Structure formats: structure tokens, C-alpha cells
Amino acid sequence: SNAFSKIIFLDLSDFNSCSIDRIVKASNLTKGAFYHHFKSKKELGLKVIELKIQERIHQGMIAPLKRPGNALDLLKDTFFHRIKLFSLYDKKHGCPFNNLINEIGGLELAYRLALKKIIDEWKQAIIRIIERGKKENNIKKGISSNAVAIYLISAFEGVRGIRKLYDNDTILAEYLLGLSSYLDHIQAN
């Protein structure tokens, strides 16, 4: 419903300290309408993770890796494209996913499991494309696909926070240089 969408797609930065009253006010809904859709703030948090965060990661970082083509090029294109798409708002506020991990990931088991599920799906997509690249002889066979996946995810998520801290796009340019160098390093000769 429209009310459901209003709540889910609010900017819920600072989710942990955000009260239901504040959510209700920001969405222009009544408390009754809120509780019609969500039994609790925890349930809202899980829906935001599922419908907003998971969808964003899937569309931007997982689905592109399933396309046909050179595996290494797909990795490079996916990470480069996503960084270049960030709006000024995205750059200033950092990654909603990473922000949630830092804010609520350690507080509640249900949140931690939902956030880990997204990382696991993303990691598996990267592992699959790396394994495909090894079979197609465009990625070195001796590298650990799991280690590369964790490294790529960590570097991508980390640079978003560093960019937010420094408020400087040079950080993203340096990241892209490092990413390009790293991916060239794992390319099969």
C-alpha cells in the first residue's frame, strides 16, 4: 500500500535512536496506520533491510554479475559503475547498508542475520563470477575466490564510509585506481 511504501522508503538513518513517533510524523501517517503494517519498530527494521537494502544491493551489485561476458570485466564494470552512480546525497551520507551494519548490526540477532544474508548473497555472486573467470582463463586459478569476494565487498563498503568522513571525491578516485590495480593483479596472463 501507499502507507507501507511511505514508511519503508523514509530516510531511516539513525534508525536505532529514531522513535516510532518520529517515523509516524515523517511519513504523515497515524500510529494506527503504522501498527497496521508493523507490529514493532524491529519488524519495520527487518522490512527496511529486506525491501530497501537487499533490493538495492541485488540490483546494483549482484544482478550485474550474472550477465554474460568476461568475468573480470563484469567485476570491474559493476564496482566502477556503482561508484560513479552515487549521488551527492549518497556520497555525503554513506552507504545505507554499511550505516545499518554499524548502527544496528550488533544489537539484535534478527537484524544481524538479515544483514549477513545480504552479504552472503553478494559474496556468493562474486565467488561464482570469479570461479567462472577461472574456468574461462581470465582470472588466475591460484587465488582464493572467497578471500577476493570478502576483500572486494569490504573495500567497497569501507570507501563509502571514508568518502563520507572526508567529504572528498578524491577518495573515490583513489579507490577506483586501487580497485583497477587489484583486479589487474588477479587477471590471468
Description of each model-found segment:
Residues 2-10, 82, 156:
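Short hydrophobic clusters on alpha-helical segments that form packing/core surfaces
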Residues 9-47:
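Helix-turn-helix
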Residues 47, 62-93, 145-152:
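Hydrophobic alpha-helical connector segments
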Residues 50-57:
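Short, basic, alpha-helical segments at the C-terminal edge of helix-turn-helix-like DNA-binding modules
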Residues 74, 88-110:
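Amphipathic alpha-helical segments used for helix-helix packing
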Residues 77-85, 120-136, 150, 155, ...:
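C-terminal peripheral helix-coil segments that are non-catalytic and often amphipathic
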